[in-house]
Amino acid sequence: MKQITILGSTGSIGTSTLSVIENNPDEFQVLALVAGKNATKMAQQCRAFQPKYAVMSDEKSAGELKQLLANTSCKTEILSGSDAVNEIAALDEADQVMSAITGVAGLKPTLAAIEKGKRILLANKESLITSGRLFFDAVAKYGAKVLPIDSEHNAIYQSLPTGIQDNLGHASLEAHGITSILLTGSGGPFRYTPLDELDAMTPDQACAHPNWSMGRKISVDSATMMNKGLEYIEARYFFNASEAEMEVIIHPQSVIHSMVRYRDGSIIAQIGEPDMRTPIAYSMAYPHRTQSGAKALDFFEIQALEFIRPDYQRYPCLALAIEASQRGQASTTVLNAANEVVVDAFLNEKVKFTDIAKINRKVVEHFDLSEPQSIDDVLEIDKLARLQTQQIIAQIV
């Protein structure tokens, strides 16, 4: 029985992970759950899965959780604060750690788990976007194992030879006969919206993804295709890919989750229903397979598969992310921080949809920073970028 800690249990990835565990009660057991402030949902999860530990981001939320679990049979130990999160992420008993805390807040607990040589199921994008090289250096140093959870990176991983799977972040694609990684994306809900109407798009419209069920922040990122841009940055670190070894393709049906192009002309793809439980189950059971609970793909229900070149006028955030990846880790860290702040402002109706790309570019072009040499450097760059973004938004509002 594998013991699993879930960082970000009340979010979309966390709940999907618990669904996979529910489908495989003889294979996986929940050791610890970590969440932000959603005490109500955490209480439901604690009652259902009886973890040994539950950690909330602050004392108030932990107090609410204690009240909700009072007079129940749940014996979960309740903790709070960032130190507790880092401590729980590094528990000796854990066989696997699902890293699904959104944002740069997930970086330190993920590194704490790596330093204990854990098997990391990585859904937290920021770990690579802000510290990709530092991240994989730590993985190698401490003998940890990382498996990607994003559907695209997981699809690529499944399509790669074991020589690369066993040496993520360092192996040469060319040496294994690979010419390029083909990263697919749906194009989001505004794929066919006239360009002159984009500035009027609302948060609810941006969050209405045609294929995937996701949280609101990542749904907005999908609408701008910043999500694909961040995945592009991640993929370069995950698979040690150069700019010339990366391709981005819009695939509206989200059936082909990504592909790998080989020297001999072969293209290997991973396909299936757009359900995050598939990559989660794959990574949890690797190198074996287990039940995910996802519906099997019915080829006879598929009308057509489309492939479209990205339009960078429609998706300026995608273009900006690719540019940032060429500049280096400082630039991608700035972009990630700026985007988190400006998307939050959009969701709170402080800026327009089209302001997201404009503000992101202003912030990225404002900074000319040296490359980070430590996690503290990364966090300092992140802090500076957030402050600059907030100042620009304040001028607009």
Swiss-Prot record:
Entry's Gene Ontology molecular function annotations: 1-deoxy-D-xylulose-5-phosphate reductoisomerase activity; manganese ion binding; NADPH binding
Top-level taxonomic group: Bacteria
Record HAMAP family: DXP_reductoisom
InterPro entries: DXP_reductoisomerase, DXP_reductoisomerase_C, DXP_reductoisomerase_N, DXPR_C, DXPR_C_sf, NAD(P)-bd_dom_sf
Keyword Calcium (UniProt): no
UniProt-listed PANTHER family: 1-DEOXY-D-XYLULOSE 5-PHOSPHATE REDUCTOISOMERASE, 1-DEOXY-D-XYLULOSE 5-PHOSPHATE REDUCTOISOMERASE, CHLOROPLASTIC
UniProt name for this protein: 1-deoxy-D-xylulose 5-phosphate reductoisomerase
Binding, NADPH: T10, G11, S12, I13, G36, K37, N38, N124, E126, G215
Positions annotated to bind 1-deoxy-D-xylulose 5-phosphate: K125, S151, E152, S186, H209, S222, N227, K228, E231
